[in-house]
Amino acid sequence: MFQRILLAALVLSAAPGVRAQAAAPPDMPATASLRADTLVLTYEGRPIFRGVVQSGGARVDVRMLADTVNDAVTQVIKFTASGGRVRVSGDVTASTQAFACEVDPAQDVVPMVRTASGPDANLLNRAVYDRARDWVISVDFPAHVVVLPKAGADSTTFSLDAEGGEVAIRFRPRFYEMHRGLRAFHPWTYTAWRPSVAGWSSWYAFFDSVTGRDVEHTADVLSRVLKPFGYTYLQIDDGYQRTPVGPPANWLDANAKFPSGLGVVARDIAARGLQPAIWTNVAFHDSAYALAHPDEFVRDTAGAPAWGNWIGFVMDGANAATMRDLVVPVYDSLRRMGWTYFKVDALRHLRYEGYNSNADYFRARGLRRDSVYRSVVQTIRDVIGHASFLLACWGIRPELAGVVDAVRVGDDGFGYGGFAEYNSFNNVVWRNDPDHIQIASADAYRATTLTSLTGSLLMLTDRPDVYLTDRAEAAKRAAPVLFTLPGQIYDVNPSRSSRIGEAAVTLSGAGPRPFDADKRPAASLYLLDVNRPFEHWSVLARIGDDTPRIRFSTLGLPADRSYLVYEFWTQHLLGAFRERFSPGAIDPRFQVQDFCIREALAHPQLVSTNRHVSCGGVDLHDVQWAADTLRGESDLVAGDDYVLVVHEPSGFRFVRAEATGAAVMSSAVRGGVRRVRLRSAGGGRVGWRIVYRGLPHGLPQGQPMGQPPSHFASQ
């Protein structure tokens, strides 16, 4: 008989039913009660889990532990069945910012970075993380668990079904802040930037030799060639300012290479339908001004303005006059000119060579260095507003969580390491910037594919005429960038993020620090789950040959069904497989494989489109099968051939393809799939239909288009 135990209730400070979004959540366990076989966890006065505990008559021992280690609170409720199995099934209720995920790395698994677009039903998920309140509830290994999202209005509900000889429910409040050590992460005060950020930067194209004419030509090419595909930002990165940098006039009154002035440049960029983006930094190299206004700068032991490598004279962020005279005028004027994207450079040097290297100055004044540092960037944010995009550069900046929209996670030049070393930060803490991509380089397809599938910041940096060549395909098929959430709230390779606390005691920013993201890839598999109301599918990018066979269960897919596997870049259908598939060799032209994986159905079905590396994630709005017809709606780019890749099982005869708002240019079978090519002169939303004749006996009409698992036994 089930042993009923009432767990001790812990009184919360928040009033029942009140959930003040601006207030910090309590750093304490939930109230836990077990009555009549029903377990309820209540946090901030609201139930976050309500479930039933079943054991089939076996005696169940219940234990609870709530403890604090290194300021991080953990609460565990463990159910152990004596000679049988125990099952805990119920609902997790959280905010609309909650998502299903993994919170702890599994043992002996292939390293793989997971992301999701839309509510995720991946069978690897063992937890629900509520970003708005920074808590996570999970089930410990080795219990078998399925976490599935449900639709909700003002909250998000997930079903949680766990079974085993032992089931342990674990609750961790203030997870990123305390358990991950991000003390500045207060997500109840801000939301992550959701729109796609894709565009062009002048740095590797022109370095500091960029001219106004270069920007004008690039704007022309970008607006005609890449803007229709989602590249909307044009960023001037250095080269426009006068020297020495520091005084506002030298930032705002451009040098002779920009004779029309920054205001005109911004208007010209915007007139082409692009977002004007600009680079600045927080260095100060005007010695005459610094010596004339020493109170506006951090001072050394002799009382003179302190100097540091890269940063020059160190602006004192605790001095209101410094902010008023040197910082606010720059960003207020640029905002008024029309600039909407601000990259702020040299922030690592302000922290390391500036504030950390002059710790005694702040200590003597009773000031926290990190607070003063954060206030500098907060001032910039307050001036430009939250409608403008703010990028911190460069290196990991834990002090700026909640102030900036994105962080350039590594050194100059595109880096792969951050995709796996800071995967849990992306679009939760900030958006990761791996730095600019040169599509003229050999790894262009690999770089754009991974950047897009992980939901990272995507900026190109080539001479614009490169985009008039076929190399532009690597860029066109990667934008816009989907808003994704991490499938893991741990880092796949924790070697960097585990040392993030060292930022507080670092004195030099000359080169990457041990906690900055690496340039080398830290994983070879990158999985994106695309979840739409009409269909669920997976996209797997592979960049290494260390996985000659891939099991579908490794990808979190049910192992009891067949899947179609199609490679996007080579346009090759590998076939239909059960349990596993062999990806084969990576084509050296692309240096990446981009597999579209959909559950194989008994009727004609869409396998992919050619529009985007997400295999339809940005362009498909509906796909249905009914009355011997495959129909859907897609967003087309004007003048760009749009290809529907359709798998046709035996027993169906193609009749015709038709479209509303686009012309059907061709329809042909090649490589085991039908390719229906559409073209629209004006672009936009298009309806299409592919009609068949003949239906296998017994196949029901209106069969779902590959839905996520819906019950516990589906794995």
Describe the function of each predicted region.
Residues 20-21, 32-33, 82-83, 117-123, ...:
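Carbohydrate-interacting/catalytic domains
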Residues 25, 29-32, 36-76, 89, ...:
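Non-catalytic C-terminal accessory domains or segments of carbohydrate-active enzymes
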Residues 25-232, 256, 341:
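Carbohydrate-recognition beta-sandwich/jelly-roll modules
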Residues 41, 198-201, 366-601:
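Active-site-proximal substrate-binding groove within the catalytic cores of carbohydrate-active enzymes
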